[in-house]
């Protein structure tokens, strides 16, 4: 775990909640997650849940993924997905819109592990450097990822070698993010 990355994640999450509360006078609201149990749920409100991020008591374990792909995941990947439960959060980075992907529940974490494993297997087959996605963009094939070799946060075009460095570290990336509520 990298403490700076964890602090930056928790700080961004709180900035997101604060921005939402200022804009909407409530905790963040999500209709898609209404029937899914999560420690993030603060209140059910009709067809939606009001939520806030929830730090994990114990970091999530990525041994299954690492064993399955025979690759040690970068510590920032483990911190990003292992430090808290949260709904996905919309944000901007240098004016570009994105959705920061998060883990809502333990079941969601199981699905994430399968997706990461599939992503890494595909990259290995295509002889690409390993990355792990952390955010979605409006462009269907462009994702924001952590390079597993360097820890750089990059914008990558899936299935290609097209990669642009956005930040040297996860902490730097998260510190530059602006909540979009």
Curated annotation (Swiss-Prot):
Gene3D superfamilies for this protein: Syd protein
A Pfam family of this chain: Syd
UniProt keyword Protein biosynthesis present: no
Top-level taxon of origin: Bacteria
Listed CDD domains: Syd
GO cellular component terms, A-Z: cytoplasmic side of plasma membrane
Disulfides per UniProt: none
InterPro entries according to UniProt: Syd, Syd_sf
Membrane topology category: Peripheral membrane protein
Chief localization: membrane
Cellular localisation: Cell inner membrane
Keywords, comma-separated and alphabetical: Cell inner membrane, Cell membrane, Membrane
Membership in a protein family: Belongs to the Syd family.
HAMAP family recorded: Syd (MF_01104)
Protein purpose: Interacts with the SecY protein in vivo. May bind preferentially to an uncomplexed state of SecY, thus functioning either as a chelating agent for excess SecY in the cell or as a regulatory factor that negatively controls the translocase function.
Name by which UniProt lists this protein: Protein Syd
